[in-house]
């Protein structure tokens, strides 16, 4: 955590997103500057883990999950602002025992807050991942209109982003959480989903579980770069060929 204005908005979105679903907030801070001034104002009900150095997304996520006890775990980036009912929708999906992971339908911020190209403002940022003919994982329909029929048809997917991922704690424990082999982060969420799929569980995107994603806002503020190319090669060396060319199912 580091972009405290976004973290504040993220936290403020939780009550309406959860509705009558009880939840516990666990924040893992990777040695953010000026953090004490912010965290001193937090409610005492929030569990705070302060790392003495930037451990990266993977280890921070694992540490946060380990502190909790609930049967469901929601991994949520501090740069994601949830819409009302999003958490409740995801929790309800787990009434189906075949569901192992539930992802979200995330959109780019509107133009006045956009950090990227204006053409993507308010459009799809994430609605699941698939593989292309080369075995590379990519985000489905990124930059498309939210209400496009093909976007709305997405349901069962190969993987979802760890920016907003809910899973069963028993699966998380069996798998061992996110794999530290991916360093500070990138593709650990994909590998987690593939492990869940290998356990004969389904990965879905709930079209009604929505939110805004400012995509790596904190990492950009503090000049943290993710090893995209290296981790992509690592992912393909470990999983290449098992799920070839799944994108055709969504087009």
Predicted stretch roles:
Residues 14-53:
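Acidic donor-binding segment of Leloir-type glycosyltransferases
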Residues 3-16:
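Short, well-formed alpha-helical segments that are part of the catalytic scaffolds
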Residues 100-101, 110-111, 129-156, 166, ...:
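C-terminal, non-catalytic tails of nucleotide-sugar-dependent glycosyltransferases
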Residues 73:
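Short aromatic/hydrophobic "clamp" motif used to bind/position activated sugar donors
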Residues 89-90, 156-176, 181-210:
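A short, conserved alpha-helix in the catalytic core of glycosyltransferases
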Residues 50-68:
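Glycine-rich, basic loop-to-helix element that forms the pyrophosphate-binding segment
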Residues 81-132:
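Conserved donor NDP-sugar-binding/catalytic core segment of glycosyltransferases
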Residues 32, 55, 79-81:
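Acidic metal-phosphate-binding loop of nucleotide-sugar-dependent transferases
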């Amino acid at each position: 955590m580091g972009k405290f204005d976004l973290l504040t908005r993220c936290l403020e979105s939780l009550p309406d997103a959860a509705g009558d679903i009880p939840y516990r907030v666990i924040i893992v801070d990777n040695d953010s500057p000026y953090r004490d001034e912010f965290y001193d104002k937090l409610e005492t009900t929030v569990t705070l883990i302060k790392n003495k150095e930037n451990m990266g997304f993977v280890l921070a996520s694992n540490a946060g999950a380990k502190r909790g006890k609930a049967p469901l775990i929601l991994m949520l980036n501090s740069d994601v602002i949830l819409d009302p009912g999003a958490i409740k929708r995801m929790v309800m999906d787990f009434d189906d025992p075949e569901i192992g992971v539930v992802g979200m339908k995330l959109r780019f911020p509107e133009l006045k807050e956009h950090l990227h190209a204006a053409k993507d403002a308010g459009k799809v940022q994430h609605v699941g991942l698939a593989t292309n003919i080369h075995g590379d994982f990519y985000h489905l329909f990124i930059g498309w209109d939210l209400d496009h029929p093909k976007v709305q048809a997405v349901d069962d997917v190969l993987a979802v982003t760890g920016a907003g991922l809910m899973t069963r704690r028993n699966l998380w424990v069996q798998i061992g959480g996110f794999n530290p082999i991916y360093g500070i982060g990138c593709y650990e969420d994909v590998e987690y989903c593939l492990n869940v799929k290998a356990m004969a569980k389904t990965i879905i995107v709930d079209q009604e579980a929505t939110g805004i994603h400012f995509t790596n806002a904190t990492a950009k503020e503090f000049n943290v770069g993710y090893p995209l190319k290296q981790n992509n090669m690592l992912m393909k060396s470990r999983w290449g060929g098992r799920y070839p060319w799944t994108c055709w199912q969504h087009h």
